[in-house]
Amino acid sequence: MENRIVTLTKKVEGMSFSYLVNNPAPGITNNARHVHPYYELMYIEDGELEFVVENKRYFLEKGDVLVIKPGQYHYARQLFRAPYARFCLGFSPEFIFDRKFAENLSDRGEKFSVDSDSSFNLLIYSLKNMANKETSHDEVLFKGVMDSLLICLEETAPDENGISTANSNFQKILDYISKNLATINEVDDIAKALFLSRSYVMHLFKSELRVGVMQYVRNKKIMLAHKMLKKGAKPTEVYSKCGFSNYPSFYRAYTAYFGFSPKEAMLN
């Protein structure tokens, strides 16, 4: 049985912080894939593992940093060396000093490597120390350190080592979904367009991302709608642009996923 120890968690407005230690036997994990509407910055303190983000696989080890964009499916696929320890920071774009900054950073590269004596390393451990305390200035302090962490990464060259891409057909499927998201209503829409069998498309998704095709498509539509709502689009205009056949079905799907209504998303 996996020995998972959550040693520290902390949440402030617009940001979450966690420090976890795992000590399982090396091998293929049973970790569930997941997706969320915010950025995630993951820093590996110890261990070696293979981590999947959409169509890419990353070999991560001590000192590596991975930046995951909102709406990207990801999970730890295989552990090569234990114990495995990592920091995770989740943050909304509007939480940091410049919401375009994280976007530009993740477009420049997803994987970075930092030295143990780097400013980034000192900052991440200062977050850990801050998470152990309760003050009336938590939000301001966390925001300041988060901004500094992103600036450190901006000044760090991306690390292209240890990155591989998935099956070429899987890449074609993801590209097709991205470009035709609003028009896809069933697996056959994808299979026919790419001259692939329905069963093969379904198999690729299960083996590569551990998720069903239409679950992936539906959640991508919801994420797109969320992004549009945050930019000021009206819920009654968003649903059709994101491929939902009617507003009630969009409302139910969105509310079930986020726990609040599309209208409430515009106000938060």
Task: Name every feature range the model reports, one short phrase each.
Residues 1-25, 66-136, 150-157:
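A hydrophobic/aromatic-rich effector-binding and dimerization subdomain
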Residues 1-59, 80, 248-249:
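Generic protein-terminus/edge-of-domain signal
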Residues 2-3, 241, 252-268:
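…primarily DNA-binding HTH/wHTH and HhH modules…
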Residues 55-70:
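Short acidic-glycine-tyrosine-enriched beta hairpin
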Residues 63, 200-205, 249-254:
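Short hydrophobic/aromatic patch on the recognition helix
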Residues 106-118, 131-144, 150-197, 207-219:
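Short, Lys/Arg-enriched, Trp-marked, Pro/Gly-tolerant hinge/linker segments that flank
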Residues 175, 179, 188, 207-246, ...:
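Terminal helix-turn-helix DNA-binding modules in bacterial transcription factors
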